[in-house]
A protein has these predicted regions:
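Charge-rich, low-complexity N-terminal segments
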Residues: 1-94
Length: 94
């Protein structure tokens, strides 16, 4: 069943390091092969909820590995029994 999870990571690093840390998280998400859309404020992923939550956890670890003393994240989950896709939400705008 497909679920959407949006993730915004806010690493506690010097301002000059924010983009490199966020880029490392996005590169990791891309490496997983899951369907995703990168936006200016968050990345939305599509897949199995358990798999997506593992990705969210790993994203926190990546931030710390890249020097963040703390990571605040905003996670949004859209879950319904029949599944939900990114395309059904925004496909008409593409």
């Amino acid at each position: 069943m497909l679920t959407n999870v949006s993730l915004q990571v806010i690493p506690s690093v010097p301002e000059s390091q924010i983009y490199p840390v966020v880029d490392a998280v996005i590169e990791y998400i891309q490496s997983t092969g899951i369907v995703h859309t990168v936006g200016p404020m968050e990345t939305t992923m599509e897949g199995d909820l358990d798999e997506l939550l593992k990705i969210v956890k790993r994203a926190q670890e990546i931030c710390v590995e890249r020097g963040a003393e703390r990571v605040c994240s905003v996670v949004k989950i859209d879950y319904k029994p029949g599944g939900v896709t990114i395309d059904e939400k925004v496909g008409k705008y593409r």
